[in-house]
Amino acid sequence: MSKNPDLKGSSFTLSVLHLSDNQIAHTVQFLQEKIAQAPAFFANAPVVINVAKVEGDIDYPALKQGISQAGLIPVGVTGCKDKRSQNLAVEAGFAVMTATNSPAQAPAQMAPTKVIRTPVRSGQQIYAKDGDLVILSHVSAGAEVIADGSIHIYGTLRGRAIAGASGQREARIICHDLQAELISIAGRYWLSDQIESQFWQQRVMLSMTDESLYLETLTI
């Protein structure tokens, strides 16, 4: 006997594209350039579009088509200023989303730390579910290391490191030599060109402060 499906609420960490104007071509070009820098990270990733700062009408069908052609999946719009803007978004196939402050939840039971003693090669992906990840070697360009907790890399990070993958904003990324393609905590990320030169090839720690990423050098 088949069982009925169950519909429950849940929460997810999604990338948010903040528009500053209604110039769709410029937005699509920006996305294409960013995705080209880390295609594996962005491939078929869901994205929410924040239109709170946009003045004037938005060509929502063109926006949706452009985002899709860039390789992302547009799932919704937030920040609509009036009902008309909401209706235009819905007609184009967007969900209209409202940001809310969720009540604090008890932290999940953390799993034992996952330790990798060998180099992480290009094309490999290592994931520490519900726990921290320790890499005792290097992470090559094209490799990806992910943890729901923090990530410690006792070598060079040339690939991508994604900590707090399930939304844990207290997560950290610590590495002995930063040359990353991408670093991310709880959905916030920097590509290589966003990392200030003073931190390049240095021993560093990445954390989140007031919803923004914060990078500092370590002297120990």
Swiss-Prot record:
Database matches in Gene3D superfamilies: 2.160.20.70, 3.30.70.260
Keywords for this protein: Cell cycle, Cell division, Septation
Gene Ontology process terms (BP): cell morphogenesis; division septum assembly; regulation of cell division; regulation of cell septum assembly
Classification via InterPro entries: CAP/MinC_C, MinC, MinC_C_sf, MinC_N, Septum_form_inhib_MinC_C
Keyword flag Transferase: no
Alphabetized Pfam families for the sequence: MinC_C, MinC_N
Subunit structure: Interacts with MinD and FtsZ.
HAMAP family for this protein: MinC
Similarity comment: Belongs to the MinC family.
Function as written in the Swiss-Prot or TrEMBL entry: Cell division inhibitor that blocks the formation of polar Z ring septums. Rapidly oscillates between the poles of the cell to destabilize FtsZ filaments that have formed before they mature into polar Z rings. Prevents FtsZ polymerization.
Name of the protein this chain belongs to: Probable septum site-determining protein MinC
Lineage start: Bacteria, Pseudomonadati, Pseudomonadota, Gammaproteobacteria, Vibrionales
Gene for this chain: minC
